[in-house]
């Protein structure tokens, strides 16, 4: 079974396990932890571990046989991330959240305890992330900096071989602990991950039958796969299956708030005019073949339980309203309004050009400047981008993961717009301490209403996954975090 390079991070999940995992509905399910309890104050999490989970067989162990996972392994694995002993981008998950002294404790071999500084309802969701996977200290100490080239986990597939920038080979873990209908997983004997340089190449290899799976689309080939209504073309339907579902990714144009005083976007009416001034439905139909939904209910995307079209009503296409707002801002028909510079990357040039042309009709002129992805991210981080194309993908399945982007005390990232709003911040802090989901979701809706009113971004669309799977393959299921798990796949 082969996949393209976009799935490399996804395949990490099939080499490791954590305490808990997500199902396709983004509900928390047991993994190595078979059960857990949370104290009434929300500060202490106690996990009861399975006693039939073993690390992959490896040279790091006596007789090359993987040993049983115990609670102390989670203490070790979490402390590696928390203390920064590894160059992990996941250090933030525990920072400021766990107790300063002994936050991770092994009560006995099968009982692991985690202690927080203050209650944080999304914590279980965070524990599903790959950073919270368990690893054996023996392998980390044996391989040192080369552990990434010799990974040892507990997942359904184990590392076999890596040809850098070419291929990653995984093989079946015959000692894996999960079963389906009494049969031990996984079903596949192995996986080959091909490191393809770009999506166009991935598409060509998929069509040629060299790969079995591809995720994502680009304008260079989207019309070869999908109709303008988002349906798989008949010429492809004999060879491929198309799977589409909500993806927790909000696409937007960000506006830096503490920018130059002469920047017209400091005027809220102009920001609102931009949001009214283009047709999201047409944009998605003509530019993305209906992969995605118009972002007309705030920043929190479809796919989260707190999402509501009714409770947070955003912007629709209303050019007359846009012109009225421009007039109220002192720029009737755009007269006197300077050209606005929009920073983007090459892969979003077509989409930004579409929007800019529609804005011309209401009197707003936009000049698109293209940057390399790394350069644009650096400018966003350093406050050098006044108007920029951005996206935000959920780290964990809770709206807090999106709303934190606008919390005034956060740096860039995640707060690239440097948005500060006293009311928003107060509600955000209240939501962090609210353990009742219904009440917390209501607070999330209030924050989205503030974002709609203040318009620190131009809301573009809520993304959707686009998976193309070779006929004859079963067991792949759709989920809103775009996770690829191969443990139940059959070919």
Language model features with spans:
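Surface-exposed binding/hinge segments that line
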Residues: 37, 72-73, 80-137, 161-163
């Amino acid at each position: 079974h082969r996949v393209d390079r976009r799935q490399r991070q996804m395949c990490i999940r099939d080499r490791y396990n954590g305490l808990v995992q997500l199902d396709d509905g983004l509900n928390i399910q047991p993994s190595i932890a078979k059960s857990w309890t949370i104290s009434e104050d929300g500060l202490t999490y106690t996990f009861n571990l399975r006693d039939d989970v073993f690390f992959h067989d490896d040279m790091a162990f006596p007789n090359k046989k993987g040993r049983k996972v115990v609670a102390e392994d989670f203490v070790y694995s979490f402390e590696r991330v928390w203390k920064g002993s590894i160059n992990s981008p996941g250090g933030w998950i525990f920072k400021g959240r766990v107790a300063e002294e002994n936050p991770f404790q092994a009560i006995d071999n099968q009982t692991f305890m985690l202690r927080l500084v203050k209650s944080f309802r999304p914590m279980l969701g965070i524990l599903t992330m790959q950073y919270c996977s368990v690893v054996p200290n023996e392998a980390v100490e044996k391989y040192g900096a080369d552990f990434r080239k010799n990974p040892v986990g507990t997942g359904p597939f184990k590392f076999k071989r890596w040809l850098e920038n070419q291929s990653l080979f995984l093989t079946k873990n015959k000692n894996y602990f999960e079963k389906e209908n009494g049969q031990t997983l996984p079903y596949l004997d192995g996986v080959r991950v091909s490191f393809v340089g770009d999506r166009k190449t991935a598409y060509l290899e998929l069509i040629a039958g060299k790969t079995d799976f591809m995720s994502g689309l680009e304008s260079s080939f989207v019309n070869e796969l999908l109709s303008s209504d988002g349906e798989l073309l008949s010429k492809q339907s004999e060879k491929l299956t198309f799977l589409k579902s909500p993806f927790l990714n909000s696409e937007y144009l960000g506006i830096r708030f503490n920018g130059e005083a002469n920047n017209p976007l400091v005027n809220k009416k102009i920001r609102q005019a931009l949001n009214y001034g283009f047709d999201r439905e047409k944009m998605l139909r003509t530019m993305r073949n209906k992969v995605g939904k118009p972002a007309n209910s705030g920043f929190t995307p479809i796919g989260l339980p707190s999402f509501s079209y009714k409770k947070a009503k955003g912007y629709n296409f209303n050019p007359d309203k846009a012109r009225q707002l421009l007039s109220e801002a002192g720029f009737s028909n755009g007269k006197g309004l300077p050209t606005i510079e929009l920073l983007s990357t090459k892969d979003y040039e077509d989409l930004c050009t579409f929007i800019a042309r529609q804005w011309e009709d209401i009197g707003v002129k936009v000049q698109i400047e293209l940057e390399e992805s790394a350069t644009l991210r650096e400018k966003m981080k350093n406050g050098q981008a006044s108007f920029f194309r951005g996206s935000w993908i959920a780290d964990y399945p809770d709206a807090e993961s999106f709303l934190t982007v606008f919390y005034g005390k956060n740096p860039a990232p995640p707060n690239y717009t440097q948005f500060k709003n006293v009311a928003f911040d107060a509600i955000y802090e209240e939501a962090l301490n609210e353990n009742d989901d219904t009440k917390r979701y209501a607070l999330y809706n209030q924050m989205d209403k503030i974002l709609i009113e203040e318009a620190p971004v131009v809301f573009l669309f809520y993304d959707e996954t686009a998976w193309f799977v070779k006929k004859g393959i079963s067991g792949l299921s759709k989920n809103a975090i775009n996770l690829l798990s191969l443990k139940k796949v059959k070919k």
